[in-house]
Amino acid sequence: MLLLDIMDSHCIHTLVDQRASSQPLEPAVETYDVSLSYGELSAMSSKLSQYLVSLGIYPEAKVVLMMEPCASYVVSTISVLKAGATFVPLDATQPTKRLAQLIKDIKPFIIITSIEVQDKARSLYDNVLVVDQTPSPWQDAPLKTGAACHVNGSNAAYIIFTSGSTGLPKGVIIEHGAFSASALARGNLTGLSLGSRVLQYAAHTFDVSVDEILTTLIHGGCVCIPSKADRLLLEPAINRLQVNHALLTPTSAKVLDPDAVPSLKTLQLGGELLPDDLIRKWCSRVRLFNVYGPTEASVACIMSEKSQKNIFGNVIGFPVGSVCRIVDPDDHNQLVAPGVVGELLIGGRILARGYLNDNIRTASSFIESPPWTSDDNATRFYKTGDLAKIDHYGSVTILGRKDNQVKIRGQRINVEEIETTLLATHLIRNCVVELPKKGPLANKLVAIVSTTSDTPHCKHPPPAAFSEQLQASVSTLDGLLRTRLHDALQDHLTSAMIPKRWIRMTSLPETTSGKVNRKEIRRWLERMDASVLQSVSLSNVESTGSRQSTRHKIQPEHEKILCRILGVNPTLLKPHLSFIQNGGDSIAAIELCRLGREIGISFWISSVLSDNSLEKLFHTSKSRFTKTIAHESQPGTPFPLSPVQRFFFDVVGNEHSSFTQYVTLQLKNRISIAQLERVIDRLVSAHPMLRARFHSENDTWLQSIPERISGSYSIFHHHGVGPPNHELMQPPVLSLASDPVLNVRLWDFDSGPQQLQLIAHHLVVDLVSWRIILDDLSKALRHERLPSAGMSFQSWCALQKEYAKTLDPKLVLPIPIISDNCAYWYPSVAQQENKHGMTETSTFSFDMLTFNSLLVGSLSKTQPIELMVGSFYTAFAKVFSDRETPTVFVESHGREPWQTGIDILQTVGWFTTAYPIHVPAQKASDLNESTLHTMRARRSIPANGHQYWCHRFLEQYEPDERKRSAPLEFVINFAGQFQQLSQADLPFRVMSTVGEETAEPQARRLSLFDIFISVEGDQLHFNISFPSWVSHRDKIHHLSTVWKDVLESAGVFSERPVLDPEPIDMLRELWHDCSLKDIDEVYWASDAQNHMLNSSSRHPSFYTVVGRWRLKCNTGAPLTDAFRVQDAWKRVITNHRALRTIFIPGDRKCGFLAVVMEQSFPMVLTGGASDTSDTNGTTRFFGLQSNERAIHLPHRIILHESNDGSILFSLEISHTVIDATSRSILMNELLDALVDIDLVPDDSHYHEYIESRDALYALSPPCQPPPCIFPPDLHCSDSAGSQLSTHVVELSQTSTANMSQICSQHGITMSSLLFLSWTLVLSNYTSSDDISFAYVASGRSMDVPGIERFVGLYVDLLILNIDTSGSDCLLDLALRVQQMSAGSSLHQHNQIPACRNPKNGRFDGQVNTMVNIRNVGIDSLRLERHDFELLLDSFEDPWDVRFFNTSCPFLPI
């Protein structure tokens, strides 16, 4: 009783100030960049409080707090309480319409905000205080002493909005006394005190954040606020801030490793049901509390400390600062006995006052003096809606809800609010929103809708028929309708309230009372089978894909090639989906590149295998071909082996046993042996490796190409009796020592068509080679011209040997692997012989359509081989629990060109490579995790493993013969499919597997386990071959069964798109409310982007390109309005990934994360009429005209309608996403969009450019030039001033002409001459011969297809260092400057003389000057399209360099 009296007599800020008086020097708030002691917090909050009072604030006036987590937020919170007002936290990232409605309900006195979100705040309300602005009136005011505002425990302290069942959120009003009572009781229980360092992790709109801040301060602890970047990686944030006390949801705690956070001593978990396994994980490592409480009970009211003896998560514990009662769910006037389930009621001083502006809902949720009240001082109770029971000891167990409220990541949501918003669109007739607790849709918000056009079925069938009716009622939801519904919800609700799945039903079942039968719908969702789930998933995918489809259709000629390669009917081709999602694979991608050449189209394999739609793929392809590198073949001259050939001889040694591949064909037209010889002669002439010879010199195997065609292959004509049979047509043994590598056999039978067999030694062919051979064979049989030859295999081997010398061993395999564990399979210590004649096979088949649905249904970018390997590891971990998972080698086609001019699309040879991947057993148990780990590993390996394989067998030669000859433990080879060989227009039919392998029984095998996966018809065939003598054979056969089960039970694969996995790991924890399906890709920003972002974070004006433009109609007619320009600009934004990119601070090592969004919501501001003479003036903007969300893109456009009918606009874009070329592209596209010209799709992936550029720079490590500071009395450590000055020096036409003449006469470029001039200036002013300065180098010379039309920051910040001593002649010095700067060109592969800017894009302390040369012509200042004219009025481009020299010659540079 005494404690309650104390609580009631104190306000929150009073308790905090008491701490400030007793411990003024102790830390109160600590962030990544600010620390406040209790004394400092008290003084700052008092100043701000007094300023609010001076503005006329009054008791319980509403003050909206809208800012990011920071120290200023804590100061603002305390100051509002000291002023006697009530603070109301709002999230600036919520939809504008929702915020506007909340502001209307709150009627705030003022909004306190920060610089970061002030624009959003000002768009919502007039009275705004930017609390962290410098200077600020409240900061400069002296601190006054005197009586504080008269506030007592019954005054309102804060208001938190929660989801409401009527479609409108509810504002819960909490008083000072209520929160103080709760905070003191709970803090004492958990041990909060001086020395506690509490993590502030929850969003401010959740009441847990109030607890993290105010309860901590009441008990004398320190509030630890991580930065945005630190919130991505919670474990480092906890360690960096030395957090020892945290309040988290079970979902957040699940991803933490107790060993990774040794400082954490107390952990409170609440907001969701606490899983038993999470209790076991944490209870022995920390003091673990299970916390329960609605917002209406001042954050929390029931708690229990968990231990190994108390692991049940639904047992929430005993009341803390409150009393609990269980009543009849239908009659709160009736108590129920202990152990009986009923509705949980909370009573006591901690209860909320009620709901803001809603007496009706307050009266229904809070009851006064029910008949069963006694002398326990609690006469007012809150009806929680939770079903629970209390045992005889007073412990509470939660058992569910009596209404339709759900919790998502700790956030309480009434599904009726979502349903009300959907029905308000008038686009549907009825709807139900559910959150299934189990089944394939577990914990996913699902919307089931019926439209006005649907015909109702039986509304309340008998219970046994419910499932059948629901399943029969499911149909596809129209993509456009789904988009409109989705957008309507985004306009009014938080992202956590947006359904993740949409299902359409012709009618919703009802109960006999006429209400929707939620119980049966929920039961049906939780028991949904795979077939229904797949149809629902695919309908979601199809509608989305269709919505994102471009208007560029595939031409019939292109469609024919696609259908031929993919083996599908044109009606089944999905142009809006990617090549992979249409059933393609890497080998089929090579075939598309090869056949594309024949019709004049050039593809890059990486583009074909990207996530781009087929429409975009063909629309952005180019009719251009790079000249093949000249490297003449020399017939008869021995040449080295390819890496895979060397691997073969390492394993088989000198036995050179037969190891062949073959194909059997049925000819449609008869052919004589003489005609066949002429056909094979053409093939062998076109493909020299089909006549190759192998021999050994000094224990080294070499190969050569005989010049003569005649006799270079063997051909036989056989006459068979009866029909063809397998034994008769068994391929012959080919000896490397005496036989040709190609054997041709023509079979004539008594009846039926001829059959042709082609048998080749594996040393000269691979699966891609067989595609080429058979395609050329079909042309030769029809007497058609064969395609032109590319680079020969001999030339490729010679170039590759040189290439291997340039590879860095540390970079070819950047992932950890483990050694093979072949000994696990040996039944005895002695190694057994691994021969082809001693093998057995375990097989299974899987439906190809179902497999594709696992990929397509996820909207992910997972490739088939990644799902195959990931599912293998999951199956292996289940079956072989007694050992670590093995390293698996994945075969690849090996035809990655490492430089322009390597054209081997039409070359026959053995190019195969293999690269190792390992998924640890602890990561393999879950299919999603296993596949993600596979992708992370696979995509980290450069060039699809080509560099690793090349280095391993050409450079890093293993001297130990035993290790060289040891087989690999596991090899997986996905052979793809040979659909183009089943076409009716071919002169033959394929009668066998193409490239089927055969070997002598005594031939050594290359691996212990060979997993061959192929597609035949509509089936995916898995064949696991292994020695018949191995141990654990029963488990191996069981592995096939489990592997198939893993795939079948996968349902629809992971929802999240597969992006660059490591950045995604960082991104996951930041955007709880953002579906990763809304994200296109994530990657680490480039060095130049990091430099710009770091600089602009210190000074927002840096690297913000501002262009002020005037758009007018040449006919004199006025433009209708600014909305036309706005719509055109949105089209431009949608067309470029760079403009849909946002940047999020990462850790200090990796810099910023670049996140590319699937959709864009550009910021478009419109102003009133403006005089034509002034485009630089300011205008008061009357509000956002865009669908602005939480995503702030790095650009905005401000539109003015001029009095003369023209449009004036200011375009502000961060330099992180554009360069000078990009600006020209954007303005030209803006004009195109205005006149409805189709925009050429920008298909760029900026991270690919970064990877290519980094690979080149890796050849030369960063150097450290000596400091070169201008003038010498300035220190580079000084930050650049905020005042920028510009001095323009214009050269006369005569001077410009003279410079051009000098350049022409002496063979130097204009840029080199300008670099020379600045070199001389620096040398003069620094009195030094060793000169360094930064300069901007263009990256558009990179050999990236289409880079000339891409928008992005295709530049790099380099440092040029040159010694001017010893250069008496200026021309010599100019040539040296030119040589040094030209060496930085990104397209060159030699060592780079200009060193890359170290320190993550910064050059502080080294140089303080930069030269940037732009080629600015008249066309970039004045543009015309039809009747429109676009003029540049002014341009700003401030850089964070003290001396920045920009040269803009109108001549080629």
UniProtKB/Swiss-Prot annotation:
The keyword Phosphoprotein applies. Residues 544-626 form the Carrier domain. Residues 37-433 are annotated as: Adenylation. Keywords: Isomerase, Phosphopantetheine, Phosphoprotein. Its cofactor is pantetheine 4'-phosphate. Pfam families: AMP-binding, Condensation. The modification O-(pantetheine 4'-phosphoryl)serine is found at S586. Its EC number is 5.1.-.-. Residues 1181-1391 are annotated as: Condensation. Residues 639-1053 are annotated as: Epimerization (E) domain. One of its GO terms (molecular function) is isomerase activity. Pathway: Secondary metabolite biosynthesis. Belongs to the NRP synthetase family. NRPS-like tryptophan epimerase; part of the fragmented gene cluster that mediates the biosynthesis of fusarochromene, a tryptophan-derived metabolite closely related to a group of mycotoxins including fusarochromanone. Within the pathway, fscC catalyzes the first step via epimerization of L-tryptophan to provide the intermediate D-tryptophan. D-tryptophan is subsequently hydroxylated by the tryptophan 6-hydroxylase fscE to yield 6-hydroxytryptophan. NRP synthetases are composed of discrete domains (adenylation (A), thiolation (T) or peptidyl carrier protein (PCP) and condensation (C) domains) which when grouped together are referred to as a single module. Each module is responsible for the recognition (via the A domain) and incorporation of a single amino acid into the growing peptide product. Thus, an NRP synthetase is generally composed of one or more modules and can terminate in a thioesterase domain (TE) that releases the newly synthesized peptide from the enzyme. This is NRPS-like tryptophan epimerase fscC. It comes from Fusarium equiseti (Fusarium scirpi). The lineage of its organism: Eukaryota, Fungi, Dikarya, Ascomycota, Pezizomycotina. The gene is fscC.
